[in-house]
């Protein structure tokens, strides 16, 4: 449970266009858990590595990071460049005594450190879609440099298929809320109200994109802090799977499987006609991108691996027989 002060850099602005005036909401994400990842790999029939060291990039309030560090023997490192986030995460680590080292550094600062070990598991949830192209490249270079052979990467990111129709309204929402130091909870609420009035006016945009109103009605009730971090950063770039795959290939990573177990059962997502079409596509990259379009998927949760190894039938059977389960219920 160590806090490491940041090193000096030549950055002209530490925010890089990211919302920092409002702290992010708290939340827990099981996909960031290496133990969960190992089970998902088993479900996909893939070999997973022994994970001794793990790292989370852009951990927010650090709830998932702290739970995973406190609940295992894995050594954890993590960074979030908003000082209030790092301080809150450090308080949690101090309380639990977790084997965890916390930084409040930017991706440029953290990813270029020379004193970090090689990691078996590296994760980032959401932030890929909210950061600049330069910061995305810092992450890719970090994966290339610091992920062990056989290591696993988790990436959660906004998908273009589900967000394309919302892009124009997001731009108006961002402009109405202001930018830089002017963003506040009140400004976010005012911007939401303005867009609500806008959507009451008949327009060709809504005629062609009827689902936009339904989705906007849903997000109106969201915490302004969530809306600010989700939609109001300078950079907001939903991407196709094919684009992410190209980035990952720079770090010698290949797609392993979805972190969402329901996607391991295609018949729950696709009808026969859809499945037949998908089965004609040889390219994994194109197939996943087309699947996202069919589902109008807004968010992907993916595992990537440096050295993909499929388990034999004997290995798979042996591992399933050795797998332990705990059944829980709500009272």
Q: What does each model-found stretch correspond to?
A:
Residues 21-52:
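Conserved alpha-helix/loop element of class I SAM-dependent methyltransferases that forms part
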Residues 75-80:
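Conserved SAM-binding motif I beta-strand of class I
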Residues 61-73:
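Conserved SAM-binding loop of SAM-dependent methyltransferases across substrates and taxa
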Residues 97-109:
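Conserved SAM-binding strand-loop segment of SAM-dependent methyltransferases
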Residues 206-331:
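Rossmann-like AdoMet/SAM-dependent catalytic core
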Residues 137-149:
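A short glycine-rich, Lys/Arg-flanked "PGG" loop and its adjoining helix->strand segment in the class I
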Residues 112-121:
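A short acidic, Gly/Pro-enriched loop at the edge of an enzyme's catalytic core
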Residues 152-182, 190, 198-204:
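Conserved class I S-adenosyl-L-methionine
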